[in-house]
């Protein structure tokens, strides 16, 4: 969902009611978070699975993009850059989208930091999430074969005095124009092509998203360089234990 400044239309699949509130992170957490136990000469150390993945420079954006998601992802990006500004960060996306302002905070931080960011779509990258997918480093934007990508214009709702409604309408149009320009920047498509495809919900297969310029590659197994990054981090952690 790419929501406007206030609210927006819901997609066919909504957030499950059984989903628990987030715990210390903006990632929407289920009632059971897997824990990872690591053994070293100093004893055992327990991590929740997302914290362990962060050690591998992996960030997961699961579920709707909102302020909770945004402030955690921004903090993770800044932290990983401070750890090693030249080493890649890997962002996995499975999201229906969400609030534009929250998504743009993540987007701007992705562009702001010096670390290259690879993006990987699994499940879906719809609305605002599709922009984050496209915003990865060139040549490093990927999707798994059965994922779905969707782009559309922002939507919003506002009630109040007529002049205030007019003001908010102009703001939503301004945001729409800005988003169109960002898709032009990252896809290489002409503005009129982007605007026409953004006019309504436009669903794409990974191959169609590749042709449109949102991703660079459709993959069905983990790229070797991602495996090397993970192994390298693990070896470094063990040597420092």
Swiss-Prot record:
Pfam families (UniProt xref) = CLP_protease
Indicate the residues annotated as transit peptide: 1-30
Q: What is its EC number?
A: 3.4.21.92
GO MF annotations in UniProt:
ATP-dependent peptidase activity; cobalt ion binding; serine-type endopeptidase activity; zinc ion binding
What is its subcellular localisation? Answer: Mitochondrion
List the InterPro entries.
ClpP, ClpP/crotonase-like_dom_sf, ClpP/TepA, ClpP_His_AS, ClpP_Ser_AS
SUPFAM superfamilies documented for this protein: ClpP/crotonase
Please indicate if the UniProt record lists Protease as a keyword: yes
- Which PROSITE patterns does this chain map to? CLP_PROTEASE_HIS, CLP_PROTEASE_SER
Q: Which of UniProt's keywords are assigned here?
A: Hydrolase, Mitochondrion, Protease, Serine protease, Transit peptide
Alphabetically, which GO biological process terms does the record hold? proteolysis
Oxidoreductase among the record's keywords? no
Name the enzyme group at the top EC level.
hydrolase
Catalyses:
Hydrolysis of proteins to small peptides in the presence of ATP and magnesium. alpha-casein is the usual test substrate. In the absence of ATP, only oligopeptides shorter than five residues are hydrolyzed (such as succinyl-Leu-Tyr-|-NHMec, and Leu-Tyr-Leu-|-Tyr-Trp, in which cleavage of the -Tyr-|-Leu- and -Tyr-|-Trp bonds also occurs)
Gene Ontology CC, one term: cytosol
Q: What tissues express this gene product?
A: Constitutively expressed in leaves, shoots, roots and flowers.
At the top level, the lineage of the source is Eukaryota
Catalytic residues in the record: 127, 152
Family of the protein in this entry:
Belongs to the peptidase S14 family.
* Assembly with partners or alone: Homotetradecamer.
Q: What does this protein do?
A: Component of the mitochondrial ATP-dependent Clp protease. Cleaves peptides in various proteins in a process that requires ATP hydrolysis. Has a chymotrypsin-like activity. Plays a major role in the degradation of misfolded proteins.
Question: What is the name of the protein in this document?
Answer: ATP-dependent Clp protease proteolytic subunit 2, mitochondrial
Record organism: Arabidopsis thaliana (Mouse-ear cress)
Q: What is the lineage of its organism?
A: Eukaryota, Viridiplantae, Streptophyta, Embryophyta, Tracheophyta
Q: Which gene encodes it?
A: CLPP2
């Amino acid at each position: 969902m790419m929501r406007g400044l206030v609210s927006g239309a819901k997609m066919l699949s909504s957030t499950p009611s059984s989903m628990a509130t987030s715990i210390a992170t903006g990632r929407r957490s289920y009632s059971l978070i897997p824990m990872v136990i690591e053994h070293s000469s100093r004893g055992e150390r327990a991590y929740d699975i997302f914290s362990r993945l962060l050690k591998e420079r992996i960030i997961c954006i699961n579920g709707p993009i909102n302020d909770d998601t945004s402030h955690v992802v921004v903090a993770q990006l800044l932290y990983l850059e401070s750890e090693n500004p030249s080493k890649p960060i890997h962002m996995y996306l499975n999201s229906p989208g969400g609030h534009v302002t929250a998504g743009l905070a993540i987007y701007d931080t992705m562009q702001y930091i010096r670390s290259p960011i690879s993006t990987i779509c699994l499940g879906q990258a719809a609305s605002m999430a599709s922009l984050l997918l496209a915003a990865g480093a060139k040549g490093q934007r990927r999707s798994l074969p059965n994922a779905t990508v969707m782009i559309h214009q922002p939507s919003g709702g506002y009630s109040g005095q007529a002049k205030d409604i007019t003001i908010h309408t102009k703001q939503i149009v301004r945001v729409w124009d800005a988003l169109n320009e960002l898709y032009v920047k990252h896809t290489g498509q002409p503005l009129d092509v982007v605007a026409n495809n953004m006019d309504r919900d436009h669903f794409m297969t990974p191959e169609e998203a590749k042709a449109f310029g949102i991703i660079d590659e459709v993959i069905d197994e983990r790229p070797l360089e991602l495996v090397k990054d993970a192994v390298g981090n693990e070896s470094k952690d063990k040597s420092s234990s």
